[in-house]
Amino acid sequence: MLSYNRFRGYLIPQIHALKLFRYASTASTSGEKIESSERPYDVGMLLRPKTKFEIKTYKPISPGLRHLKRPVSDYLWKGKPFRPLTVAKRKKGGRNETGRITVRHQGGGHKQRIRLVDFERKVPGVHRVIRIEYDPGRSGHIALVEKLNSETANKSYILACDGLREGDTVESFRSLLKTGSNGEPVEMDPVLAAEIEDGTFAAKNLKPGNCFPLRLIPIGTVIHAIGVNPNQKAKLCRSAGSSARIIAFDGKYAIVRLQSGEERKILDTSFATIGVVSNIYWQHRQLGKAGRSRWLGIRPTVRGTAMNPCDHPHGGGGGKSIGNKPSQSPWGVLAKGGYKTRRGKNVNKLLVRDRPRGKEKR
């Protein structure tokens, strides 16, 4: 088995030789070396071992611990959040202003504060990661960052990507691509445009956690926190372990393949963050007991066949039978193919390929 140092010495030249960018570097094709004071890659970020598949189990001294499973996240901050970036969460128990339940299975739970996460990343410059924190309002983790060499030392929360740790640096390059009032990009600095054209810009700055306009991201790059429009916040791929991939460019659009298999067009002046959202093994957790669901504010889900006829169409009757009727919701909406969400074809003009359904393969 190769040692870490031998593996490191073998992998670095291979990484430098790969053509991972949308535009191949003219220096690399001619055999010349790129003269730069910095390494073209953040080697520490590339060679750092990814989050290992480790699930923490507990000694079954109680029924609630027997089936409890959690992803190992020893790098998380153990203290309280940065209070100026939080607001109080006023829970309503799933009820509207009239007091009626509009969303079932909600209520109770531990007291929480909402973390104000920056999904726009408009502040340029290098930011240092102070710590990685747990956020009760989302499945992924968040990172508290602070801008370097700033008089105000503004702090903000961003969505942490997989592999991001305390002391790392991230940067947003959204301000490089200026857009006019009509959303079209304006002329760019000639020096910067030349670096983008020959691939040296991507070689120096492309690393997980950095935010770029889609136009500056090479084909094949894994991204998350994707903005649909240039002037809006990130809306796609924000949950734990989610990501997308740029597969092509078509005019002013970038074609992105989502995890569901759907391929859609997004304006290349929109932005995205490099990498995968953190806490990638969140889907393998097991709460272990009903009480932990109640701590999360989730109330029990009662089967319709266990209710009375006045409460559900499946209720009443002898035994567990629902009668000679199709499965349906409490409001009579058919559960198996009776409710359509699309009223016609080609509703989304930016959809290139729909996600696989049924037995279709991705």
UniProtKB/Swiss-Prot annotation:
Region (Disordered) residue spans: 306-362
Entry keyword Ribonucleoprotein: yes
UniProt keyword terms in alphabetical order: Mitochondrion, Ribonucleoprotein, Ribosomal protein, Transit peptide
A GO BP annotation: mitochondrial translation
Alphabetical list of Pfam families matching this protein: Ribosomal_L2, Ribosomal_L2_C
Location relative to the cell: Mitochondrion
Biased composition (Basic and acidic residues): 351-362
Superkingdom of origin organism: Eukaryota
Primary location group: mitochondrion
Chain segment of the transit peptide: 1-23
A molecular-function term among this protein's GO annotations: RNA binding
InterPro entries, per database record: NA-bd_OB-fold, Rib_uL2_dom2, Ribosomal_uL2, Ribosomal_uL2_bac/org-type, Ribosomal_uL2_C, Ribosomal_uL2_CS, Ribosomal_uL2_dom3, Ribosomal_uL2_RNA-bd_dom
Gene Ontology CC: one annotated term: mitochondrial large ribosomal subunit
Family per similarity comment: Belongs to the universal ribosomal protein uL2 family.
Annotated function: Component of the mitochondrial ribosome (mitoribosome), a dedicated translation machinery responsible for the synthesis of mitochondrial genome-encoded proteins, including at least some of the essential transmembrane subunits of the mitochondrial respiratory chain. The mitoribosomes are attached to the mitochondrial inner membrane and translation products are cotranslationally integrated into the membrane.
Subunit structure and binding partners: Component of the mitochondrial large ribosomal subunit (mt-LSU). Mature yeast 74S mitochondrial ribosomes consist of a small (37S) and a large (54S) subunit. The 37S small subunit contains a 15S ribosomal RNA (15S mt-rRNA) and at least 32 different proteins. The 54S large subunit contains a 21S rRNA (21S mt-rRNA) and at least 45 different proteins. uL2m has a Na/K ligand binding site.
Protein name: Large ribosomal subunit protein uL2m
